[in-house]
């Protein structure tokens, strides 16, 4: 395999899908040497097959707003790879959603799910619907209209969606209600991220953030150190950042910065239970602003238009969108003396930012490893649904911690360089790829 040749073909075929091409290029660069040591992969054209989704569903979503006006959005489901299990991946409702973003997310999800060692393939979906400023009734009507098409292609052994940006427990509930009506069966295994009263798993809302902090903790332990007493900056203030802030605080770190589209919050006193709970209130307001945090807590200061990375910290954890942390941000982070950066959002750093971190020799880990706790706990929710049982918080947390430990070990196994530096990007990509590639090889050309 020659990465440049394959990328040239994909760029000619999908010239406008920059996010998808970026994700594919990162993986191919990481695996090229290992791949070329396996002629059986080349003979079966594994790479050429693995970079293309198995199926893409695109559909119209028509709904009525509170003013009685008819609105139309586009819905998608990208069923990327089912070599190791049913398609599994979230639904994103955001105006930026397009096919390139969902293909990149589905591609990343394939390897992320493989890293968990749970039997889950990769998929992703969503819509360009913007929940911001919408009433509960409007969101319900949209979710119901969205499910009118999606229900035809999902199921516990076929495709199991979950939440993502713009899709939380409320939206999952609305969609499941419509699914149940259409399918005429009570099958909670068709979606994850459900409410606790009807088949959801303890800790699922917090799981992505919890798992990310566990992964960071393992990274620090590799250096014989801990995260207790260290300062943390997070971007975002939704479920992911909330979970990360909660677990980091529990482990003794001090979360001093969060951010939103309107700017950044700096709180030198760090987070406590009241402040962490208020993050969820801000997200639930649908206003997508973080400034009110500084109005409520006198110790906090709001910086309009700034990012969390402008604040000096030990650990930087982007928790919002793809490519949110740029090369300019990386320069600022390095100048501030940050010694660990971990993507909690999917592909949260640009390639230039990652290169800057690796050149500087600081610890850096990619989203497909760091944020795998979310889908891992979704997998645990699927298991509980299939077995008709419910595990305690301690049981789920123990299993989550063990999964994140195993992912870290896999990254170290494949990512340790001759000079001792751990290239977590390379390690995660190779570990995930090898599992999926071997499964595809054994299942024949399909």
Question: Language model features by range: what are they?
Answer:
Residues 263-364, 369:
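Rossmann-like adenosine-cofactor binding region
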Residues 2-23, 219-220, 334-446:
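Adenosine-phosphate binding glycine-rich loop
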Residues 1-202, 435-443:
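N-terminal ligand-binding/catalytic initiation module
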Residues 138, 170-177, 202, 243-247, ...:
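Short acidic, glycine/serine/threonine-rich loops at helix termini
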Residues 68, 164-165, 201-208, 233-237, ...:
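Active-site nucleophile and cofactor-binding loops and adjacent substrate-binding regions
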Residues 195, 200-310:
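Glycine-rich phosphate/diphosphate-binding loop of Rossmann-like nucleotide-binding domains
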């Amino acid at each position: 395999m020659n990465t440049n040749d394959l990328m040239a073909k994909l760029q000619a075929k999908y010239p406008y899908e920059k996010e998808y091409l970026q994700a594919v290029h990162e993986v191919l660069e990481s695996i090229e040497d290992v791949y070329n040591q396996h002629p059986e992969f080349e003979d079966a054209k594994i790479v050429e097959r693995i970079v293309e989704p198995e199926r893409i569903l695109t559909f119209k979503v028509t709904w009525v707003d509170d003013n009685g006006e008819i609105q139309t959005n586009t819905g998608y489901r990208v069923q990327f790879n089912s070599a190791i299990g049913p398609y599994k991946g979230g639904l994103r409702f955001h105006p930026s959603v397009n096919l390139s973003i969902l293909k990149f997310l589905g591609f990343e999800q394939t390897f992320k799910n493989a890293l968990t060692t749970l039997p889950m393939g990769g998929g992703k979906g969503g819509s360009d619907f913007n929940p911001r400023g919408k009433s509960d009734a409007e969101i319900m009507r949209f979710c119901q209209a969205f499910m009118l098409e999606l229900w035809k292609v999902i199921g516990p052994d076929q495709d199991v969606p979950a939440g993502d940006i713009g899709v939380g427990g409320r939206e999952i509930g609305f969609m499941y209600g419509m699914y149940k009506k259409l399918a005429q069966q009570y099958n909670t295994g068709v979606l994850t991220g459900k409410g606790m009263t009807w088949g959801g798993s303890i800790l699922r809302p917090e799981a992505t953030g919890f798992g990310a902090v566990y992964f960071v903790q393992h990274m620090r332990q590799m250096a014989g150190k801990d995260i207790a007493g260290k300062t943390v900056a997070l971007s975002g203030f939704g479920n992911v950042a909330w979970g990360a802030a909660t677990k980091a605080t529990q482990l003794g770190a001090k979360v001093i910065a969060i951010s939103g589209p309107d700017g950044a919050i700096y709180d030198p006193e760090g987070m406590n239970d009241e402040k962490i709970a208020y993050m969820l209130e801000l997200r639930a307001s649908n206003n997508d602003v973080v400034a009110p945090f500084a109005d409520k807590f006198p110790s906090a200061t709001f910086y309009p238009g700034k990012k969390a990375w402008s604040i000096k910290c030990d650990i930087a954890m982007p928790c919002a969108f793809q490519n949110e942390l740029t090369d300019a941000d990386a320069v600022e982070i390095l100048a501030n003396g940050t010694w660990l950066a971990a993507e909690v959002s999917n592909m949260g750093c640009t390639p230039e930012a990652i290169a800057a971190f690796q050149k500087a020799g600081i610890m850096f880990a990619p989203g497909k490893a760091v944020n795998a706790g979310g889908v891992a706990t979704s997998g645990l929710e699927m298991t509980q649904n299939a077995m008709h049982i419910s595990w305690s918080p301690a049981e789920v947390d123990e299993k989550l911690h063990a999964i994140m430990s195993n992912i870290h070990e896999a990254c170290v196994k494949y990512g340790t360089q001759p000079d001792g530096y751990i290239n977590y990007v390379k390690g995660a990509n190779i570990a995930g790829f090898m599992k999926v590639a071997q499964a595809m090889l054994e299942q024949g050309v399909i």
